[in-house]
From Swiss-Prot:
Organism, as annotated: Bacillus mycoides (strain KBAB4)
One of the record's GO cellular component terms: cytosol
Cofactor mode of binding and number, as noted: Binds 1 zinc ion per subunit.
Primary gene name: alaS
InterPro entries for this protein: aa-tRNA-synth_II/BPL/LPL, Ala-tRNA-lgiase_IIc, Ala-tRNA-ligase_IIc_anticod-bd, Ala-tRNA-synth_IIc_core, Ala-tRNA-synth_IIc_N, Ala-tRNA_ligase, Ala_tRNA_ligase_euk/bac, DHHA1_dom
Primary enzyme class: ligase
Domain notes: Consists of three domains; the N-terminal catalytic domain, the editing domain and the C-terminal C-Ala domain. The editing domain removes incorrectly charged amino acids, while the C-Ala domain, along with tRNA(Ala), serves as a bridge to cooperatively bring together the editing and aminoacylation centers thus stimulating deacylation of misacylated tRNAs.
Keyword Repeat on entry: no
Protein name, entry field: Alanine--tRNA ligase
Broad class of where this protein is predominantly found: cytoplasm
Cofactor: Zn(2+)
GO terms for MF: alanine-tRNA ligase activity; aminoacyl-tRNA deacylase activity; ATP binding; catalytic activity, acting on a protein; transferase activity; tRNA binding; zinc ion binding
EC number: 6.1.1.7
Catalytic activity: tRNA(Ala) + L-alanine + ATP = L-alanyl-tRNA(Ala) + AMP + diphosphate
Lineage of source species: Bacteria, Bacillati, Bacillota, Bacilli, Bacillales
Amino acid sequence: MKQLTGAQIRQMFLDFFQEKGHAVEPSASLVPHEDPSLLWINSGVATLKKYFDGRVIPQNPRITNAQKSIRTNDIENVGKTARHHTFFEMLGNFSIGDYFKEEAITWAWEFLTSDKWIGFDKELLSVTIHPEDEEAFTIWNEKMGVPKERIIRLEENFWDIGEGPSGPNTEIFYDRGESYGNDFSDPELYPGGENERYLEVWNLVFSQFNHNPDGSYTPLPKKNIDTGMGLERMTSIVQDVPTNFDTDLFMPMIGATESISGEKYRNGDLEKDMAFKVIADHIRTVTFAVGDGALPSNEGRGYVLRRLLRRAVRYSKKLNINRPFMFELVPVVGEVMKDFYPEVLEKKDFIAKVVKNEEERFHETLHDGESILAEVIAKAKEEKTTVISGVDAFRLYDTYGFPIELTEEYAEEAGMTVDQAGFENEMEKQRERARAARQDVDSMQVQGGVLGEVKVASEFVGYGTVATESNVVALVKNGEYTDSLQAGEEGQLMLDVTPFYAESGGQIADRGYLLADGVKVVVKDVQKAPNGQNLHKVVVEEGTLTKDAAVKAVIDTKNRSSVVKNHTATHLLHQALKDILGTHVNQAGSLVTSERLRFDFSHFGQVQADELEKIERIVNEKIWESIDVAISQKAIEEAKEMGAMALFGEKYGDVVRVVQVGDYSLELCGGCHVDNTASIGIFKIVAESGIGAGTRRIEAVTGKSAYELMNDQVGLLKEAAGKMKTNPKDILTRVDGLFTEVKQLQKENESLAAKLSNIEAGNLTDSVMTVDGVNVLAAKVNVADMNNLRTMMDDLKNKLESAVVVLASVNDDKVNILAGVTKDLISQGYHAGKLVKEVASRCGGGGGGRPDMAQAGGKNPAQVEEALAFVQEYVKSVSK
């Protein structure tokens, strides 16, 4: 067996399958594009669903990839086991209706055993198959020469994740030798069992059935191959190390952590070894996820990242690291992965900044968690229990990121324990929710539909022309082929030549008409068909449209003109954002219509008003410079060398379309654009907002829409100036003057209210009653708000020196209640917080506070007098 690095194994796998006629699919972003069913890309096949379910027909039915993936369903096991990871790479080869079992098995065996490739000893390999898969048994036994005793039949060798493609699978295992297990009385010591000796190398899935909604299985019209080989596990076997963490994919991060901590990995302390592993795993995940646009937050993907970072920081304390340090490991990850993922090093500064910021926040959160825990302990003592509930412990862990181990330590210091069973029960509930979510999202669509069968050519020529003489080459109604569409009927069609742009890259589809003698057809929408043709959604307004009809296809040029202005403006905006906010800005989505443009982008924090102003000015300056827009076809590598931006979620072929705005903007784009920026006219930002963790959105208008917006704003300005009896240019001065007048009136009003309050407070002293030797005052007063109530309360307490006072006011059907107790009475057991809570409850409200002063609110003004009457009862109850 050869000595290989993890990077060499990855490249060798891809090279092997390229030799077998496979197209290499680039590793997709971890953040799923147009697949809301997934939180993360979690397998090699996840990005290929569109091919397997027939929505898109790949140019090459043979595909191979090395796909970065994230799975977080077993975070607690990371570091405890030899092979659990949150981030991993899955190597795979796939066949979409092309080759099947024999080729898949033959090539897998060749890659693993040939001296040209991995070079495993055949005698150390065993395989598992489904008990009824005689075809796989025959191939393994008769063609590959695997002895019967090393072909194990297991019922679980059937891949099925719900509705959609399913089928038997075969797994290949490597025997690592007796040092990893030689107790043959162990019922799990066999290939496919739970043991450390026989490691699964490769899983080959033969998708040959459809799992139907009624639970039945029917043969697929096209049989598929889906295989997966974990790079980390394969590397541990090739490098002959005990765990994945001991490979060159993890050791550089572990080594860097050793340098930071002064501790040593594999020095006899299992707890410290686990800490090293957790840190190495989690920094890989966070680095790649942030690089792909995810940012820490309290929801969704962001919450996963926050949880991973906090778990790593917690484990770092076992290595005596008590400061932010994970950010220092980001460039180490970049160096390890630079051969296949050079973008990590390119983004390392931004990723490190995000990680450091989150670490610093967690160190602050630890203090917050301590405060919450102190309240939990105090509450438990008040309830005379020595056990912190599992629900409270889980809330600290899940909401505040407070480690259960720390909760146990604090509890022990307070002479208490934690309900571990209750905590584990809450954890299991969370796992069940995660498992249910995964089952819901992993199933694929069922194959079918006539559109996937349409192979006729349809050429898009709309970059250079707005009308064509075309022929209807395919006509569909209600999902089935048809020969004609009558007036009033809707359908879908393909043209041999079309000027209509199909929606993609954020740009909406063209609208327009198909015209012929006596026939008028409205084109409402255009989308890409599974085989890449432009598919027109139409409704017949006049006449009858037939298949093979000759028509004139005409787009709505007014609509297209507005769209292209917004599209080119989007490119200018993208570059301006990078100029002002930083190179970390990446497109996270866009919408380009005739009315407006919407641009979503990655950015950590709100865009400030002065930044927006600069961004808007840059875009307008580029418009006013009248820059020519050049469009060319380039080889993908040449385009990247030129510095062209490749956009989020887009797939590119060997030859790409490059859109260049002078020397300012350079992007790969298949959309429609103006010839010169001057055509855009003007650019105006309408709104900026946050739409999720680390993602911002800018909405803007150009051209006529921008003119109309500014006209409306000028009109509003003139109207406001008229009402203020001033000129538009003097309106700010007038507004400042009005603010000054309002502030002066507020001061006068407050002064008058204070005087009235003092007068009313003076009159109230005549209403003081003595209850069991205690001065008691409970009154409804006429004041504007709680602040005036407090002023009156302070005045009364000073005048009365010793008293229990409750004041209530009603404004706009809202009840304000304030209770006060002088210091001498607090020591006798009187408590303003408890009193105000009781009073408020009697008029539909609630509240509380300190022993000397407390406030509350109520909802039923009619019950205020009755509520105040309770004050005497309260005083009597305390004085007993």
